UniProtKB/Swiss-Prot annotation:
GO terms for biological process: tRNA modification. Its EC number is 1.14.-.-. The active site is at C200 (cysteine persulfide intermediate). InterPro entries: Rhodanese-like_dom (IPR001763), Rhodanese-like_dom_sf (IPR036873), Rhodanese_C (IPR022111), TrhO (IPR020936), TRHO_N (IPR040503). Residues 319-350 are annotated as: Disordered. Pfam families: Rhodanese, Rhodanese_C, UPF0176_N. This is tRNA uridine(34) hydroxylase. Gene3D superfamilies: 3.30.70.100, Rhodanese-like domain. PROSITE patterns: RHODANESE_3. Catalyzes oxygen-dependent 5-hydroxyuridine (ho5U) modification at position 34 in tRNAs. Belongs to the TrhO family. The gene is trhO. It comes from Salmonella paratyphi A (strain AKU_12601). The keyword Oxidoreductase applies.
Length: 350
């Protein structure tokens, strides 16, 4: 029986990926559809992806599939064909191609079965996730941005909004998607008569959010087809003004795609204009935060003098200290002035 999970160390896999000469293409996609046996589907799909040297992160659940992956360029069309024929529900599925891509986004394939492909926290048997808002294409998005009767809602987390967003878009301040949904309903009550336009990175969160808003009595709801990634690509192709400002945060080693030249965020240490996320080099911290080149040099890639001092300790002493505390993996929430427990590179399903 074939091995259906990775058995090689992360360090070895990363070194192997970095040594590759063939370029790779970063792709994301999702689909809400009924999967009768997620585990069986996962195992079959794992073999297909492994045979094509696909790396990345894939979640499957009874409600569908959510994937962010990296595919060798020479195998992209074969991948597309095999994905489309794997299940009739996936035939013709839109694939979001990365806007900026160094081919080093992933180095291992992780495929997991979960309760939901996006952790929404919804526990309402009457909720119909298929009753979604209408799609908006790039030209429609720009028209809506000029419509005084439209309100744009960013359904991403605070660290995503901080480095880039649509003009005048409302932030729903939260650390996870499940926290955002009830807050969005509460915050938008005063705009119930407006046109509600929801967006996210690639479309998966705003699609479900649009259904949730309709479930809660909002009638004029839209969401951007393919999210920020598809919008920016189509706007550029069609010669339209790109109305997204700043950088689009992405959930892989790149941590961001430049959409516009504006830098709207600031270094969390000195306040200089900067929108580059990084993780604290101290293995006992791994804080996700924004750091400018000057502070990176000053603090040796760490988030604080304390972490800088700890990083300089002998490795054995560092391990001893890490064992005595809850391992960090946190995100700095500048808007609330506190740290939040999270993965080093946040989970896109949260």
């Amino acid at each position: 029986m074939p091995v259906l999970h990775n058995r090689i160390s992360n360090d070895e896999l990363k070194a192997k990926m970095l040594a590759e000469s063939e370029p790779r293409t970063t792709i994301s996609f999702y689909k809400y559809f009924t999967i009768a046996s997620p585990q069986q589907t996962r195992d079959a799909l794992y073999q297909v992806f492994t045979a094509l040297d696909v790396f990345g992160r894939v979640y499957l659940a009874h409600e569908g599939i959510n994937a962010q992956i990296s595919v060798p360029q020479s195998k992209v069309e074969t991948f597309r064909q095999q994905l489309y024929t794997f299940d009739p529900a996936l035939d013709g599925l839109r694939l979001n191609i990365a806007l900026e891509d160094d081919g080093k986004s992933f180095w291992v394939l992780r495929m997991k079965v979960r309760d939901r492909i996006v952790a929404d926290g919804i526990d309402d048997p009457t909720f119909d996730a298929s009753n979604v808002g209408d799609y908006l294409k790039a030209a429609d998005v720009n028209a809506m941005l000029d419509d005084p009767d439209a309100v744009f809602i960013d359904m991403r987390n605070h660290y995503e909004y901080e480095v880039g967003h649509f003009e005048n878009a409302l932030e729903i301040p939260a650390d996870t998607f499940r926290e955002q949904l009830p807050k969005a309903v509460e915050m938008l009550r005063e705009h119930a008569d407006k046109k509600i336009v929801m967006y996210c990175t690639g479309g998966i969160r705003c699609e479900k959010a649009s259904a949730w808003m309709k479930h809660n009595g909002f009638n004029k709801v839209w969401h951007i087809e393919g999210g920020i990634i598809e919008y920016a690509r189509r706007a550029r192709e069609q010669g339209l003004p790109v109305r997204f400002i700043g950088k689009n945060f992405v959930f892989d080693e790149r941590m961001g795609e430049r959409i516009s030249d504006e830098v709207i965020a600031h270094c969390h240490q000195c306040g200089a204009p900067c929108d580059s996320h990084t993780n604290c080099k101290n293995d006992g911290c791994h804080l996700l935060f924004i750091q400018c080149p000057q502070c990176a040099s000053k603090f040796n890639g760490c988030c604080s003098e304390q972490c800088c001092e700890e990083l300089a300790l002998p490795e054995e002493e560092q391990r001893r200290r890490r064992a005595g505390r809850e391992n960090g993996n946190k995100i700095f929430n500048k808007s609330r002035g506190r740290l939040n427990s999270k993965l080093s590179i946040p989970d896109p399903a949260e």
